[in-house]
A protein has these predicted regions:
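Rossmann-fold NAD(P) dinucleotide-binding segment
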Residues: 9-77
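Rossmann-fold dinucleotide-binding core
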Residues: 27, 53, 58-138
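Cationic-aromatic interfacial patches
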Residues: 150
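NAD(P)-binding Rossmann-fold cofactor-contacting core
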Residues: 1-5
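A short glycine-threonine-serine/GTX helix/turn-capping micro-motif
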Residues: 129-140, 187-197
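Small-residue-rich helix-loop
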Residues: 159-172
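Interdomain hinge/lid region at the active-site interface
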Residues: 174-204
Length: 204
C-alpha cells in the first residue's frame, strides 16, 4: 500500500497514533476495539490532545460511550462511525457512515470521512452511530433471509431464478441485496464479502 500512497507502517496502535490529527480504526468486535485503544499498546496512550479519533468498527453502543468518556478525559475527541456498503463500497470509496458524537469534532472530521463515503450523517450523541448500524443490520438480515428463502423456493419449483429476479427486481420486492447478491446466491457461491458469523455477532 505504501508503495502507491504516502504513509508509513507502525508496529502498534500506540505508535500509529503518535502526532496524528485524525486517527481511524476498523476492527472486528468490542474486544478487538478495546485492545487497540485501551490495551498495553493501545492508541489512547499516545493520542495527542485536540486530535479526533474516528472508529469505523461495528461494535456496541456501550463501548462507544466508554471510549467517548475516556477520550474526553485525555483531551481528545471520539466519534463512533460504523460503516455500511461492504467490500465493494470500501474499495470504491462509497461507504455509508453513521456517526455518533459531538458536532464540533464531527464537522472537522467530515471532510476526511468524505474521502471514503457517499453518505455521512451525525445521528446523535456518542453511541448513536452504533445504534443506527444495528437498525441497518436488522434490516439487512431480514432482507437476506427473505431473499434466500425465496430463491430456494423458486429453484425447488423449477423456475429459472435469474429470469425471476430480473422481473421481480423491477417491482416492490426490489432491494440492494437482491440486485447485488442474487447471482452468487443462485450459484451457491459464498466465498467473499461479509461473513455470516459477523452478522451473528452484530445481531447478538
Amino acid at each position: 500500500w505504501i508503495k502507491e500512497y504516502k504513509g508509513k507502517i507502525a508496529d502498534t496502535p500506540m505508535d500509529a497514533a503518535k502526532d496524528c490529527d485524525f486517527i481511524f480504526t476498523c476492527v472486528g468486535n468490542d474486544n478487538d476495539l478495546r485492545e487497540v485503544t485501551l490495551g498495553d499498546k493501545g492508541l489512547f496512550k499516545t493520542a495527542k490532545k485536540g486530535s479526533i479519533y474516528v472508529d469505523n468498527t461495528t461494535a456496541s453502543a456501550n463501548i462507544a460511550r466508554e471510549l467517548y468518556k475516556e477520550a474526553k478525559s485525555k483531551g481528545f475527541d471520539f466519534l463512533d462511525a460504523p460503516i455500511s456498503g461492504g467490500q465493494a463500497g470500501a474499495e470504491g470509496g462509497i461507504l455509508t457512515v453513521m456517526v455518533g458524537g459531538d458536532e464540533a469534532p464531527y464537522k472537522k472530521a467530515e471532510p476526511v470521512i468524505d474521502c471514503y463515503s457517499k453518505k455521512i450523517k451525525l445521528l446523535g450523541p456518542s453511541g448513536s452511530g452504533q445504534l443506527t448500524k444495528m437498525v441497518n443490520q436488522i434490516c439487512i438480515a431480514g432482507l437476506v433471509q427473505g431473499l434466500s428463502e425465496a430463491i430456494n423456493f423458486g429453484m425447488n419449483a423449477g423456475l429459472n431464478m435469474h429470469d425471476v429476479i430480473e422481473v421481480i427486481s423491477k417491482g416492490a420486492a426490489q432491494s440492494w441485496q437482491m440486485e447485488n447478491r442474487h447471482k452468487t446466491m443462485i450459484e451457491d457461491k459464498f466465498d467473499y464479502g461479509f461473513a455470516v458469523d459477523w452478522m451473528r455477532k452484530d445481531l447478538k
